[in-house]
């Protein structure tokens, strides 16, 4: 039997009919804050408001619903960093199927609990592997041994067609409001979303520039399409943007992206954190890291989009509240507002007051101070964190720190030391 490896607009139209009474038609909203900030019209496609707070339900339900009754009776499996797993779990409960869902051990607890909530007694969750790719290998082995049906999170034409329904929905909504998009920004993990969206847009909105956005620490599609012209596996990835941190994209999604995507943007994980906080404080939107990628990319494209009409897909809103401290820290580091040093501190009365008076600026704040006094030595090691009001004050701060202790270590520039703090 020949395995289908291409996706057409007809496939997406058929998927749209299957999903019509299953998924929520999420809002397409003109965002006034972003529009003013970038001097253009910025629309947000709010898939963070989907039933499972992610677009992944579209692809999961479509891929499962096309299985034969015999195949469905054998049960389904999947590997996912969270959102695809929720889509599979939701579908398993809806269609009363047995599902075994494999998730990396690094998956935020919030996402694990949501999978269990949506799937209830129909779903068994297995936490395994440090990355999605390790988790995937375990899932495929289990699927083969138990003769079940693996629901691929991105490298499957039915999954891609389901994700593509988002594009059809967007274009129908924009047509009602007489809106034409000049640019579309969407996140790339394994490539299912960008493949489905771009397939539909290239036929029905061919003048729209499709921009794929990846975290800089996991830019597997860019490395495959632009750098190597073949699918490659990244040896190491930053797993912070867990919904888009994939070491290897799909063979099918690679071919579609290569044909349809106009440009790729890599966004620093710290910039993503700043966007998450900005979206929450300015727009009351709770976006997960992968969900904020598309908006983060606007800063890279600000000169191109001025005066244009832009749409950003907010792909998910499953953010674990326990990650907020790390998100704030990464944002402050990226914005050059928070700085850590290791100092040799004099062990004498008044040394701390001297440091505060001589080193800190009038608006600087100490956010961390760890010190263990050793009576047998003249100095003790101090780890100190200093938060600035303006990142332009950093040069003067470093000069004052160097004068206080010429042997100091600036932790921000040492990834290994910094990882011990965050």
Curated annotation (Swiss-Prot):
Instruction: Identify which cofactors the protein needs according to its UniProt entry.
Output: pyridoxal 5'-phosphate
Which biological processes are named by the entry's GO terms?
A: isoleucine biosynthetic process; L-serine catabolic process; threonine catabolic process; threonine metabolic process
Q: Would the keyword Amino-acid biosynthesis be found if you checked this record's keyword annotation?
A: yes
Q: Which UniProt keywords apply?
A: Amino-acid biosynthesis, Branched-chain amino acid biosynthesis, Isoleucine biosynthesis, Lyase, Pyridoxal phosphate
Reaction(s) catalysed by this chain's protein: L-threonine = 2-oxobutanoate + NH4(+)
Modification N6-(pyridoxal phosphate)lysine, positions: 56
Q: Which PANTHER family match?
A: THREONINE DEHYDRATASE, MITOCHONDRIAL (PTHR48078:SF11), THREONINE DEHYDRATASE, MITOCHONDRIAL-RELATED (PTHR48078)
Protein name per Swiss-Prot or TrEMBL: L-threonine dehydratase biosynthetic IlvA
Organism phylogeny: Bacteria, Bacillati, Bacillota, Bacilli, Bacillales
């Amino acid at each position: 039997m020949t395995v289908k490896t291409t996706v057409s607009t007809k496939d997406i139209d058929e998927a749209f009919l299957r999903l019509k009474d299953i998924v929520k038609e999420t809002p397409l909203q003109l965002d006034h804050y972003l529009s003013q900030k970038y001097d253009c019209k910025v629309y947000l496609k709010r898939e963070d408001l989907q039933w499972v707070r992610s677009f992944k339900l579209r692809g999961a339900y479509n891929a499962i619903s096309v299985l034969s009754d015999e195949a469905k009776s054998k049960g389904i499996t999947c590997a996912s960093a969270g959102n695809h797993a929720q889509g599979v779990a939701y579908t398993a409960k809806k269609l009363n199927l047995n599902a075994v869902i494999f998730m990396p051990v690094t998956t935020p607890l919030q996402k694990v609990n949501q999978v269990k909530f949506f799937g209830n007694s129909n779903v068994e969750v297995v936490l395994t592997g440090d990355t999605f790719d390790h988790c995937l290998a375990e899932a495929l082995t289990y699927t083969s041994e138990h003769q079940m049906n693996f629901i691929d999170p991105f490298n499957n034409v039915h999954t891609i067609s389901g994700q593509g329904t988002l594009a059809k929905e967007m274009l129908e909504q924009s047509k009602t409001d007489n809106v034409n998009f000049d640019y579309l920004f969407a996140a790339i993990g394994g490539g299912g979303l960008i493949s489905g969206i771009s397939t539909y847009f290239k036929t029905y909105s061919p003048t729209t520039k499709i921009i794929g956005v990846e975290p800089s620490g996991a830019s597997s599609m860019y490395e495959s399409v632009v750098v190597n012209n073949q699918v490659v596996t990244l040896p190491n990835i930053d797993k912070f943007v867990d919904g888009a941190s994939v070491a290897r994209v799909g063979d099918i999604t690679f071919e579609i992206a290569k044909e349809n995507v106009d440009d790729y943007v890599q966004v620093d994980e710290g910039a993503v954190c700043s966007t998450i906080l900005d979206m929450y404080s300015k727009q009351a939107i709770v976006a997960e890291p992968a969900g904020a990628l598309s908006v983060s990319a606007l800063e890279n494209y600000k000169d191109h989009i001025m005066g244009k009409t832009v749409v950003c897909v907010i792909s998910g809103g499953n953010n674990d509240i326990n990650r907020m401290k790390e998100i704030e820290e990464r944002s402050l580091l990226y914005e050059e507002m928070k700085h850590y040093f290791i100092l040799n501190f004099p062990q004498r009365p008044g040394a701390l007051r001297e440091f505060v008076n001589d080193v800190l600026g009038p608006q600087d704040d100490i956010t961390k101070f760890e010190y263990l006094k050793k009576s047998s030595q003249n100095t003790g090691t101090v780890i100190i964190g200093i938060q600035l009001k303006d990142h332009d004050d950093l040069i003067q701060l470093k000069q004052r720190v160097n004068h206080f202790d010429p042997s100091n270590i600036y932790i921000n520039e040492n990834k290994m030391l910094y990882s011990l703090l965050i």
